[in-house]
Design a protein with these regions (language model features):
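Helix-start (N-cap) detector for alpha-helical repeat units in TPR-like alpha-solenoids
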Residues: 32, 66-70, 104-105, 138-139, ...
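Register position in tetratricopeptide repeats
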Residues: 44-45, 82-83, 116-117, 150, ...
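Conserved structural position within tetratricopeptide repeats
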Residues: 57-60, 64, 94-98, 129-132, ...
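Canonical tetratricopeptide repeat
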Residues: 68-75, 109, 143, 177
Length: 213
């Protein structure tokens, strides 16, 4: 009799478990939805910390809200950059990329801030990542060609400029850059004139220099 009771009890628990799990999932989904709405409202009011806190909690309950959280990080980063808080902006773009590493736009936005800080190497790396994700985006090649030019890398700047013109043959900025780069290439290819032979004569200034008393 005792064994029969135990069996019935275990069987009853097994039947209840899916129902309990489903009830918890429904509760979590409702809570996540509420938190996401709170986050969206806070974001609308530019209450960034509150928005991020709400969306972090929503994402912990339901991962589908992760993209919303990434978007708020982007918004806060943009606001920080607008206020010249560039390091804060870079930090928030980094958080957004942890959530959405396939979003080329975030790499582009962070690169723009890095250029404000004159950190061309990091900006170059971010534009390169953006290009991997969107290889036909003219804007990314245009910005990267500019960075290469600033760094004095004429060869790679020309390669990116040619890519821009292949995708957008009438791009005026690229046409101007190509002409400028061609001029630089020709100047580099022209050998420097020989240095004048050293004169053995004393310069006029030296000839009339005052003697020590």
């Amino acid at each position: 009799m005792k064994k029969t009771f135990v069996f019935i009890f275990v069987a009853a628990l097994a039947l209840c478990a899916p129902q309990l799990s489903e009830a918890q999932a429904t509760k979590d989904a409702k809570e996540a939805n509420k938190l996401a709405r709170d986050g969206a409202e806070a974001s609308k009011n530019q209450e960034w910390d509150k928005a991020i806190d709400s969306l972090r909690k929503a994402t912990a309950l339901d991962h589908k809200y992760a993209t919303n959280l990434a978007a708020v990080y982007q918004q806060r980063a943009y606001a920080a950059a607008t206020n010249q808080q560039f390091q804060d902006a870079i930090s928030d773009y980094g958080e957004a990329l942890k959530i959405s590493p396939e979003d080329a736009r975030i790499y582009e936005q962070r690169a723009a801030v890095e250029m404000k800080l004159n950190d061309m190497d990091k900006a170059l790396a971010d534009y390169s990542e953006a290009i991997k994700l969107k290889p036909d985006e003219v804007r990314y090649y245009a910005h990267r060609s500019y960075i290469y030019e600033v760094k004095g890398d004429i060869k790679n700047s020309m390669a990116d400029t040619d890519k821009v013109l292949k995708l957008d043959p009438k791009n005026q900025e690229a046409i101007s850059r190509k002409k400028r780069l061609e001029t630089l290439q020709s100047l580099r290819a022209t050998p420097a004139p020989p240095a004048p032979a050293a004169s053995t004569k004393t310069s006029p200034a030296a000839a009339h220099s005052p003697h020590k008393p």
